[in-house]
From Swiss-Prot:
This is Small ribosomal subunit protein uS19. GO terms for molecular function: rRNA binding; structural constituent of ribosome. It comes from Nitrobacter winogradskyi (strain ATCC 25391 / DSM 10237 / CIP 104748 / NCIMB 11846 / Nb-255). InterPro entries: Ribosomal_uS19, Ribosomal_uS19_bac-type, Ribosomal_uS19_CS, Ribosomal_uS19_SF. NCBIfam families: rpsS_bact (TIGR01050).
């Protein structure tokens, strides 16, 4: 389900403060965030966020194509190690 238009995009308040401070200072450090549910806004383009995936902060460099998506989409939480092989002995 899509969020209703009249509500606007959800962004954590602390995330906005961190992004504004990074823009004002002009430094390009990784901004650590835990809010995977926050929407990426146009003012975040060009910044690098460290999105927490449960183990570590995955660096996500925001570009124009990411606007409107959620931060969690770019920081996978599960690792796929492949399906197990055939346990039966193969006959030739």
């Amino acid at each position: 389900m899509v969020r209703s238009v009249w509500k606007g995009p959800f962004v954590e308040g602390s995330l906005l403060k961190k992004a504004d401070a990074a823009r004002a200072s002009g430094r390009h450090d990784v901004i650590k965030i835990w809010s995977r549910r926050s929407t990426i806004l146009p003012q975040f383009v060009g910044l690098v966020f460290g999105v927490y995936n449960g183990q570590k902060h995955v660096p996500v460099s925001v570009n124009e194509e990411m606007v409107g998506h959620k931060f969690g989409e770019f920081s996978p939480t599960r690792t796929f190690h492949g399906h197990s092989g055939d346990k039966k002995a193969k006959r030739s």
